[in-house]
From Swiss-Prot:
Keyword line: Transferase, tRNA processing
GO MF annotation terms: methyltransferase activity; transferase activity, transferring alkyl or aryl (other than methyl) groups
Name of the molecule in the record: tRNA U34 carboxymethyltransferase
InterPro entries cross-referenced by the UniProt entry: CmoB, Mo5U34_MeTrfas-like, SAM-dependent_MTases_sf
Family statement: Belongs to the class I-like SAM-binding methyltransferase superfamily. CmoB family.
Species this protein is from: Hydrogenovibrio crunogenus (strain DSM 25203 / XCL-2) (Thiomicrospira crunogena)
Catalytic activity: carboxy-S-adenosyl-L-methionine + 5-hydroxyuridine(34) in tRNA = 5-carboxymethoxyuridine(34) in tRNA + S-adenosyl-L-homocysteine + H(+)
EC number: 2.5.1.-
Gene Ontology annotations of biological process type: tRNA wobble uridine modification
SUPFAM superfamilies, A to Z: S-adenosyl-L-methionine-dependent methyltransferases
Function text: Catalyzes carboxymethyl transfer from carboxy-S-adenosyl-L-methionine (Cx-SAM) to 5-hydroxyuridine (ho5U) to form 5-carboxymethoxyuridine (cmo5U) at position 34 in tRNAs.
Quaternary structure, from the entry: Homotetramer.
Cysteine pairings via disulfide bonds: none
Length: 332
């Protein structure tokens, strides 16, 4: 587990710079549990593959401001390229991306670049900002945030597979870059004050998995500085269908979907939580071109979760996934 723990050697000074040094003791205790070698039965498969990845030299240059996060050096030999490909494939399924590492294109399930293209034009400039990304997955958007000038990009996601993918990418993209990963939930972050230090807080694709969406929004607000910006992306239902959908069992084959509000209702939630200037900046029905099965994620994907006779409905008969991006400001 050494590479997981080494990730934090440069993180603690960054935390101090962000006026969150008082978090360190609590985070170290939480990480000790999260990074227990027995925490995930797949670690015996991932750890040797991660060692293989880390044995390769870091890349000479990286590109963070285009669709695929790229890292490249002198061309690898075909043998080395195949060795690296197999090591990276040990971390399947790759869900959020895409990435291109030394000529190896990791075609992820999601075109996360498409989401970023929809979100980024509406953001306040990220230049010099401290950014918190809740539910960051493999960390694709953390790199895009740095590409747009963020001073610090901190991702939070309990998935150890996602952290493993992130560490593999960071090895090539740049170990010194200020992007970090905490394999925790939002609820596990320290609540000791001051905690209102982040200029922008993202929560994308998380709210509908929360049993208490209002608590989730309030938790997000806790870490925003006064005047900071919340970016909330979640499933919604068309306004014409009412205010709220509570799926009876599964939604698009997901059994952990609790509340899907209309855009109007979601706006009311944000206002109830004390946010101002609440606006919906994007509304998009997810297509089978944006979320699909690939060589790097060869499990079922969106096409398998929709009604085979009507792609505007899920297999359970609900409206197909419609995602809204809401932006709101925390009062000064």
């Amino acid at each position: 587990m050494k590479h997981y723990h080494q990730h934090y050697s440069s993180f603690w000074p960054k935390l101090e710079e962000a006026r969150l040094g008082h978090w360190q003791n609590a985070l170290e205790a939480a990480l000790e549990t999260a990074l227990d070698p027995d925490a995930n039965g797949n670690l015996p498969k991932w750890l040797p593959a991660l060692e293989t990845v880390m044995a390769f030299p870091s890349s000479d240059s990286a590109e963070l401001s285009q669709s695929a996060i790229k890292a490249h050096s002198q061309p690898f030999s075909e043998d080395d390229k195949e060795k690296l490909t197999q090591a990276l494939k040990a971390f399947m399924p790759w869900r959020k991306g895409p990435f291109e590492i030394e000529g190896i294109y990791i075609d992820t399930e999601w075109h996360s670049d498409w989401k970023w293209d929809r979100v980024s034009p509406h953001l306040s400039s990220l230049k010099g900002r401290k950014v918190l990304d809740i539910g960051c997955g493999s960390g694709y958007h953390l790199w895009r945030m740095l590409g747009d000038g963020a001073e610090l990009a901190l991702g939070v996601d309990p998935g150890l597979l996602f952290m493993t993918q992130f560490l593999a990418i960071k090895h090539f993209v740049g170990e010194s870059l200020p992007a970090y990963f905490l394999p925790l939930t939002l609820e596990q972050l320290p609540k000791t004050q001051p905690s209102e230090v982040f200029d922008t807080v993202f929560s994308m694709g998380v709210l509908y998995h929360r049993r208490s969406p209002i608590d989730h929004i309030m938790d997000l607000k806790r870490y925003l500085k006064p005047g900071g910006e919340l970016v909330l992306e979640t499933l919604v239902i068309p306004d014409a269908q009412g205010q709220l959908l509570v799926p009876k069992e599964r939604y698009a084959q997901m059994n952990n979907v609790w509340f899907i509000p209309s855009v109007q209702e979601l706006g009311h939630w944000l206002e109830k939580c004390g946010f101002k200037n609440v606006r919906c900046v994007d509304l998009d029905q997810t297509s089978v071109k944006e979320q699909r099965t690939t060589e790097w994620m060869n499990w079922n994907s969106l096409a398998d979760f929709l009604d085979p006779n009507d792609s505007n409905k899920t297999i359970e008969g609900y409206s197909a996934p419609l995602r809204a991006v809401m932006i709101a400001d925390k009062p000064c």
